[in-house]
């Protein structure tokens, strides 16, 4: 599915990155992270080939010509999930996928009637069963941050140099822990 179709079929789209959580560092290199959910067109849903699951668009990757390009000020990192994939992951308690359920109204880029209905179902989707996945995700983030699991991840070398670790990554890790406790 191409970007035009993914955006045309979107039912809800909003900010999901550090800005929406109040964790942006205002260092002039903030990108814009957005997530959306779309209802794939009938021809995609009924296709004989692998069904559409997600569309990813990154202006940094497009500009640099490589997928691992670091986003800079003004870049857009957009992921649009099919409703089918989003639902499967949400019911498993995936912390990232559930962000759109809690994104404040003023941080939504787009929300039609179906998107509003989906967001209204939040109490039916979220249960205490999500605490396990949240805890697992939190532990994996900590292990990546400290190098206990695989190679130590350094996304922001300037923060690593200044504080000894990536403080923004650490704040996202703590946010996940608090969100999991609140469920």
Pin down the residues of each PLM region.
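Short, solvent-exposed secondary-structure capping/transition elements
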Residues: 44-47, 99, 182-183
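Conserved NTP/Mg2+-binding pocket subregion across the NTase superfamily
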Residues: 57-181
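Active-site nucleotide-donor binding segment shared across nucleotidyl transfer reactions
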Residues: 1-49
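Cytochrome P450 catalytic domain signature, combining two hallmark sequence patches
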Residues: 52-55
């Amino acid at each position: 599915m191409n970007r035009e179709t993914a955006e045309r079929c979107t039912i809800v789209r909003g900010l999901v990155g550090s800005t929406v959580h109040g964790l942006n560092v205002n260092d002039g290199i903030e990108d814009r992270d957005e997530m959306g959910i779309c209802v794939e067109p009938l021809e995609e849903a009924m296709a004989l080939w692998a069904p559409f699951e997600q569309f990813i668009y990154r202006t940094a990757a497009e500009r640099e010509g490589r997928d691992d390009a670091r986003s800079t000020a003004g870049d857009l990192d957009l992921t649009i999930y099919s409703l089918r994939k989003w639902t499967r992951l949400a019911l498993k308690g995936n912390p990232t996928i559930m962000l759109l359920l809690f994104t404040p109204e003023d941080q939504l880029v787009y929300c039609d009637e179906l998107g509003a209905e989906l967001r209204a179902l939040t109490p039916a989707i979220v249960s205490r069963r999500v605490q396990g996945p949240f805890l697992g995700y939190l532990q994996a983030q900590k292990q990546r941050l400290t190098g206990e699991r695989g190679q130590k991840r350094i996304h922001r070398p300037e923060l690593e140099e200044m504080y000894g670790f990536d403080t923004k990554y650490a704040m996202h890790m703590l946010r996940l822990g608090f969100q999991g406790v609140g469920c």
